[in-house]
């Protein structure tokens, strides 16, 4: 607790924990706290604060963590997310690790909030989504509908069709699972509901980058400035 109570220690060890708990206060129920997100959407605040004060040590990209194959490596969370989520297609709500589940939300934060010279810069997008949720009566909606609403709200706020991104990270896919998130609750999304959201979002242009789901803090400059890819195919 010392690093939380001492201002001189807070920047080094207490930032995440403080923002984590305040993040719980800002988890608007139910629209920003549907099943599987109890320890995820609150950490959006933690990851942003940690990056603000330690941009050279982004937590998800540098922390020693499980890579999904039983190996503990720096940046293991992102490796786990990219392998199981993007490549293998695992459903996002079924990711067991809350930090792995945080990765795509962090990617959206990086793309829209942390790239100030980009034409798509919308630093307040998450706050705008929260404001929509705050002023919308979502009482009685299923958890699947809440997840769909979140994706719809993000598309509305940024003015772009992010359905390909949400599909690749495992959020916009059919699911019918009983999930344990401080108690068991069903999360159901049908193929028809996925198709309906894709049709709705098609009114917006696609993001300039078609591969936001590969973005990390390490590649932010390349995305922001749309730099050409360097290296040799198959060699790196």
Region annotations inferred by a language model:
Residues 142-236:
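Beta/coil-rich, acidic/histidine-enriched accessory regions frequently appended to metallopeptidases
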Residues 76-149, 155, 171:
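Non-catalytic carbohydrate-binding regions of carbohydrate-active enzymes
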Residues 36, 40, 119-127, 164:
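Short, solvent-exposed positions on alpha-helices
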Residues 21-24, 53-54, 121-125, 161-162:
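Loop/turn elements at helix/coil->beta-strand transitions in domains of secreted/extracellular proteins
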Residues 1-110:
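Catalytic cores of extracellular degradative/oxidative enzymes
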């Amino acid at each position: 607790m010392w690093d939380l109570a001492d201002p001189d220690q807070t920047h080094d060890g207490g930032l995440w924990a403080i923002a984590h708990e305040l993040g719980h206060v800002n988890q608007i129920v139910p629209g920003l706290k549907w099943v599987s997100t109890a320890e995820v959407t609150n950490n959006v605040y933690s990851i942003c604060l940690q990056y603000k004060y330690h941009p050279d040590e982004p937590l998800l990209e540098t922390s020693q963590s499980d890579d999904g194959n039983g190996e503990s490596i720096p940046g293991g969370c992102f490796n786990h997310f990219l392998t199981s989520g993007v490549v293998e297609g695992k459903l996002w709500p079924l990711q067991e690790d809350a930090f792995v589940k945080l990765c795509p939300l962090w990617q959206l934060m990086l793309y829209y909030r942390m790239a100030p010279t980009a034409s798509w810069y919308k630093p307040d997008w998450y706050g705008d989504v929260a404001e929509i949720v705050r002023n919308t009566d979502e009482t009685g909606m299923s958890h699947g509908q809440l997840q769909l609403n979140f994706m719809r709200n993000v598309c509305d706020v940024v003015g772009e069709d992010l359905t390909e991104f949400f599909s690749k990270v495992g959020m916009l896919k059919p699911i019918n699972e009983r999930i344990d998130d401080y108690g068991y609750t069903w999360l159901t999304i049908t193929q028809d509901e996925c198709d309906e959201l894709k049709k709705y979002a098609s009114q917006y242009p696609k993001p300039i980058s078609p591969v936001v789901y590969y973005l990390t803090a390490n590649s932010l400059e390349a995305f922001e400035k749309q730099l050409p890819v360097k290296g040799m195919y198959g060699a790196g």
